[in-house]
Structures are given as C-alpha cells and as structure tokens.
Amino acid sequence: MIMQVMPRPEDFRNTHFSSLIKFRIKRILMICSNYDAFIMEEDGKIESQVYKEYVGLNMSNPPTFVWVESAAAARQTLENEPDIDMIICMYNEIDRDIFPLAADLKAEGKQIPFVLLMHYSKQIRKKVMSQTDSGVDFVFSWHGNADLILAIIKLFEDKRNADYDILETGVQAIMLVEDSIRYYSTYLPELYKLILKQSNEFLKETLNEDQQKNRKRSRPKILLA
C-alpha cells in the first residue's frame, strides 16, 4: 500500500464551506437478492448502521436507500426515480442482467456510480474481473461491515469533488494505491474512520460555526488507484 499526501494549504479563511463537497450522495439503489437482504438484516440493518456511523462521526444528511431484488427491478426503479446517485449491487450469479445493466447505463451516458459487492472467492473474482466492459466502477469484498458502505459513499463523493476541492481550493488528498480487492476493501473503511475522527478533533480548535463547517468540509480527500 502506498499513500501520497499532497501539500496542506496554509489558509482556508478565504474559502467558504459551501463551495466544498458540492456533490453529495443522497439516494442509493441497492440491488440484492432476498437471501442476501436477509443476511444483511442478520448482520444488522445497513441503513441503521450507516446512520449511526454518520451520527458518530458528526456527519450530516446520511443517504437514503432504495432496495430491489434484481437488475430488472433496478431498471424500472431508475426509470421512475431519476434522483438515484449511486447503485450498489450484491453479486448474484443467477441474475445475469447485472453486468448488462451497468454497461447500458454507461452507454446511455448516465454517470451513476455502479459498485459491485461480492463474498470473496477466487472463482467469483475470476468471473467478475472477466467482465472488462461491464460498466462496473469498483468491486469490493463484502464482510458484513457497514463501515465499507460508508467508505464507498465517501470514496465516490471525493472522486467527484476532487478537481475543484483539491486543485482549485488546495484541500489535501491521500492516494491509496492497491489492486487487491480484499486489501482495499479492508483499508478504506479504516482510513476513512481515521481521517474523519481526526477532522472531528480539529473542530475543537475552531472558534465559530463557519470555521467548524470549513474544517469539516476541508478534510483530506481519499482517492483509490
């Protein structure tokens, strides 16, 4: 694992917090079989855990989730609900329309991030990685930990906001270089929790509400390569 930190800006006083993190993920479409949905319920409700993570890390406006059972149902939902910001799909070998759905969305010019979760095995990894033109943005190994969902959300928010927040404003960036699905699926949640907790510690040094919001939004971006 290699991490590269860009230079820290000396002063954010001239940057208003509203200009940072302009893109936020507010609504997530979850594609998940009844069985996997049941397992997630057994592990703990994802929505509740993500909400608790947001509250625990002093983060506002947690996203809402829309649950469907198949790629076909997802297509219908996307037609009826144009405000979907992200799609997270639990890999299901029976549902053969998942990869065509992701590819079709990209072909239609829709820039909705499409993330695939899988219970890691070499056989499944080989099948997934063979879909080179699938339209899937990232593949993650699922261990039943809601921290990973939070990390995925923040990863794509950081990616969309990087050009302005980093290049124009001077926000720091941490580059995680890792090609192992299992490793980056483990590293990212821990890295985000560390960064967000440190940001909350820095809030104690601020003097007013605007300074707090500025520091909160100017936390280092995390990019995965």
Language model features with spans:
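Conserved phosphotransfer microenvironments
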Residues: 9-10, 36-52, 60-63, 67-114, ...
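Non-catalytic signal-transmission and effector/linker regions of two-component phosphorelay proteins
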Residues: 1-66, 131-138, 142-223
